[in-house]
Amino acid sequence: MIFVISPAKALDYETPPVTARFTTPDFLDDAAELIDILRTCTPADIAGLMSLSDKLASLNVARYATWSRPFAPDNAKQAILAFNGDVYEGLAATTLGEDGLAWAQDHLRILSGLYGVLRPLDLMQPYRLEMGTRLSNPRGKDLYAFWGERITTELNRLLDLERAAGREAVLVNLASEEYFKSVKPKLLKGRLVTPTFEDWKDGRYKIISFYAKRARGLMSRYAIERQLDEVEDLKAFDSDGYAFVAEASDEHSWVFRRRQD
């Protein structure tokens, strides 16, 4: 079973990492190609392209300028510890321990506009490049064209490894719609399950972005702590009061709901 999650805009490069273990991203050559394109952009270009303030645009232009290989612990940080948004609050990776991080390294992947696919312990340098950015490049008009089938091919490689190990070849999609558009479901060599998280508000259940993002991190942690092999075991997920609702779910879309009165 393989899980995919989205990255975060917020980054933490101040807190020391809780592990000395690290790996290097598989798609660094592709990332370097994108960095070369981004280095041709002015702060005004970046502000317009990414809808950023002048201050944030200048920060990211500086990041592109200083981005350099090779990655090492003194100039980069493990991805699962560097991202700092709602998903990562739920995941709380700093308290997973070495065993948890090791399991996550094999079963969890972070989709990235710049790095393509990241393992949790892959070192990364700070950046801002959301998957939906319409950055023109030699492969097409945007990042979906740039990554093409590369991300899907990598996920299929992982699903093949799961199958070879006698485990279920299932991809659990805990990424946002923007990021999962970089995956081509029809080409996946395994079952796809997409959990959704709904909260009760104004007389009905609905997806509330902040809570849903955090729940994706909570479910990732739930699987990591239990080292789950069977996707059916995810139906027992009950963190923060969520519960699986069979009548609202189907084979591929699993609904979890919470009502806080």
Swiss-Prot record:
It comes from Azoarcus sp. (strain BH72). This is UPF0246 protein azo1887. GO terms for biological process: response to hydroperoxide. Belongs to the UPF0246 family. One of its GO terms (cellular component) is cytosol. InterPro entries: YaaA. It comes from the Bacteria. It holds the Pfam family H2O2_YaaD.
